[in-house]
Amino acid sequence: MRCKMENQYIIKGGTPLKGEVTIGGAKNAALGILAAAIMTDETVTIENLPDVRDINVLLQAIEGIGATVQRINSHTVKINGSTIGNITIDYDSIRKIRASYYLLGALLGKYNKAQVALPGGCDIGSRPIDQHLKGFRALGATVTIEHGMINTFADSLVGNHIFLDVVSVGATINIMLASCMAEGRTVIENAAKEPHIVDAVSYTHLRAHETEADL
């Protein structure tokens, strides 16, 4: 039985390809880098951002915690984290884009405390983030879950050897962000290796955090 295809691409070859094309930035790479940008009090300029909903929603969440966000154009933004006055990421931001929880690792790393709504509201089992929390605890943070909110705080964060039970892009980025400001060295084993992970590593290395990826 053949499935009826309502939409098709019909390609007729035999003609040499020529011309130019501009490749846009990767959304998943941009999300991690935008979260990391709040960790410094200097102004960070990020170029070649894709002009898509998820990016704009995360920028709104970053503004919501008090950071300064200046849109230069649809693909360039300046972020300054020195004006942050709120360490809570509310459920509305998480509901719109799950990657808002990257701000949890960034805020924990910068201020040793952060609060974020569970991605599934009060239902932690909907899309579990246990590997994120495991990593934060390994760095020395106390993690509690109350009334649909994840609360993290630490007197100080200390590097550790962390093994992820499952490969997780989100956990890898979140733990990496938190560990950037921790004392000592952190090793994340069984980490995700997607290209946007490498981009986030490259950014943190550029910001003078000594970060390496063994691929």
Residue ranges of predicted features:
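Short, Lys/Arg-enriched N-terminal segments with co-localized hydrophobic residues
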Residues: 1-4
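Conserved small/polar residues in nucleotide/adenosyl-binding loops
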Residues: 204-211
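Structural motif
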Residues: 6-51, 76-124, 153-193
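Active-site cofactor/substrate anionic-group-binding motifs, chiefly glycine-
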Residues: 71-72
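Well-ordered mid-protein domain cores that form the structural environment of catalytic cofactors
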Residues: 127-138
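A glycine-rich helix N-cap at a beta->alpha junction
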Residues: 67-68
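Intrinsically disordered, low-complexity linker/loop segments enriched in Gly/Pro
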Residues: 127, 144-157, 195-196
